[in-house]
Amino acid sequence: MKLLEEFIQEKGTVLPGNVLKVDAFLNHQIDPVLMQAMGNEFAKRFQDLGITKIVTIESSGIAPAVFAGLALSVPVVFARKKKSVTLTDNLFTSTVYSYTKKESNDISVSKQFLTVDDTILVIDDFLANGQAALGLLEIAEHAGAKVAGIGIVIEKSFQQGRELLNKTGIPVYSLARIASLENEEILFLEEE
């Protein structure tokens, strides 16, 4: 998606350890015009798959997921990383490792919001090692829900995440695919 690539080039920053900082439009400050365009792009890609719910992880996946949900007219469910007083039992859970934060988190979704009747689109902000998406797939499996597709905002194609997700047989679509972050230069793969 050319618009997203332009945002990444103009406002993204490469940090040591192959980390791409995109807090100017996605991870801290959110650009709603970009989010709407991304939501529409995800909807266009997945509109014929009978999606009934979108599932993501808090917090940076929420904005693109909500705009995709708006475009598809379906609810959005986000997995929580921290338990709250209102989210204590009757949960589907999985443990995921964060590449950026270098820590594991238990993620949870209330059993009330995912069922065997759901056809899910998973949306996540980044695909690096694939752990967040795999955790969401595990939660969907616990619920007995069908995962029809995985939408990624920014994929680091030089890491193993895409390969792991491809092994699931579930279609994966990334809006921006990064080939390299070497020498603080952002190089993209061609669009899918």
UniProtKB/Swiss-Prot annotation:
Molecular function in Gene Ontology: xanthine phosphoribosyltransferase activity
Similarity remark: Belongs to the purine/pyrimidine phosphoribosyltransferase family. Xpt subfamily.
UniProt gene name: xpt
Alphabetical keyword list: Cytoplasm, Glycosyltransferase, Purine salvage, Transferase
Name under which the protein is recorded: Xanthine phosphoribosyltransferase
Subunit and partners: Homodimer.
Top-level EC class: transferase
HAMAP family from the UniProt entry: XPRTase
Pathway: Purine metabolism; XMP biosynthesis via salvage pathway; XMP from xanthine: step 1/1
Annotated source species: Listeria monocytogenes serotype 4b (strain CLIP80459)
EC number from the UniProt entry: 2.4.2.22
InterPro entries: PRibTrfase_dom, PRTase-like, Pur/Pyrimidine_PRTase, Xanthine_PRibTrfase
SUPFAM superfamilies: PRTase-like (SSF53271)
Subcellular location: Cytoplasm
Protein residues bound to 5-phospho-alpha-D-ribose 1-diphosphate: A128, N129, G130, Q131, A132
GO biological process: purine ribonucleoside salvage; xanthine metabolic process; XMP salvage
GO cellular component: cytoplasm
NCBIfam families reported in the protein's UniProt record: PRK09219.1 (NF006671), XPRTase (TIGR01744)
Residues annotated as binding xanthine: L20, N27, K156
